[in-house]
Amino acid sequence: MTESQDTPITTDGEARPHRRIKSFVMRAGRMTEGQQRGLDQGGPLYILPLAESPVDYDQVFGRSAPRTLEIGFGMGHSLLEMAAAAPEQDFIGVEVHRPGVGALLNGVLTEGLKNLRVYDCDAIEVLNRCVADNSLDRLMLFFPDPWHKARHHKRRIVQLEFAELVRRKLKPGGIFHMATDWEPYAEYMLEVMSAAPGYRNLAADGAYVPRPEERPITKFERRGERLGHGVWDLKFEKVG
């Protein structure tokens, strides 16, 4: 995380004059043929522009259906699998890494999916500018950068202010689902979300939930399991 930008998180729809620290680093990456195909052929069909006002996603998808938004889908394997397994639902992915966007869109083209759209820009801007309040059934944040060093903790995306932004965008009863493979970050997210108003932890013990069946296991996660590494899932429901 070496960059900042002019548009901070807002919970009242108003821009703030200070500059916001980004929670991600823009990485250069070489495109494969398939990824480039995804961008060239799928981009015009499935990449949504950053809007100035809330988007009517019923119009975008041509129907009203349960709607999930994932922040930072990486190479898109899990999101693609989830969208293919639930054609009755609509999915929106947000990712700034162009090879990842291309990989996901290549999969969308290959599988002929109609229930997935993509933003290739900052997720905070997408939430603030494009997503209406009380409109999402679920928001997913899987394996975000934990920013291990203490001096970098301010760069973590999960903060009280972010939790409030997510809460506003979720419908009543909507779910904020997080997952991480680094236990200190899991503990940190649990602490933040437990302090965030307007949420209920869905874990029976008030901590973590078992891996939900709807979250696919990635190759990285399987390798970690073989090495004895854990993964922690957190699910918080919007209440009130």
From Swiss-Prot:
Ligand binding (substrate): K149, D181, T218, K219, F220, E221
Keyword Transmembrane included in the entry's annotation: no
Enzyme class label: transferase
Alphabetized Pfam families for the sequence: Methyltransf_4
Record field: catalytic activity: guanosine(46) in tRNA + S-adenosyl-L-methionine = N(7)-methylguanosine(46) in tRNA + S-adenosyl-L-homocysteine
Catalytic site positions: D145
Classification via InterPro entries: SAM-dependent_MTases_sf, tRNA_(Gua-N-7)_MeTrfase_Trmb, tRNA_methyltr_TrmB_bact
Residues where S-adenosyl-L-methionine binds: E70, E95, D122, D145
Gene3D superfamilies cross-referenced by the UniProt entry: Vaccinia Virus protein VP39
Keyword terms of this UniProt record: Methyltransferase, S-adenosyl-L-methionine, Transferase, tRNA processing
GO MF annotation, one: tRNA (guanine(46)-N7)-methyltransferase activity
One GO cellular component term: tRNA methyltransferase complex
Stretches with biased composition (Polar residues): 1-10
Pathway: tRNA modification; N(7)-methylguanine-tRNA biosynthesis
Enzyme Commission designation: 2.1.1.33
Disordered: annotated segments: 1-20
Function: Catalyzes the formation of N(7)-methylguanine at position 46 (m7G46) in tRNA.
The protein's name in its UniProt record: tRNA (guanine-N(7)-)-methyltransferase
Organism: Pseudomonas putida (strain W619)
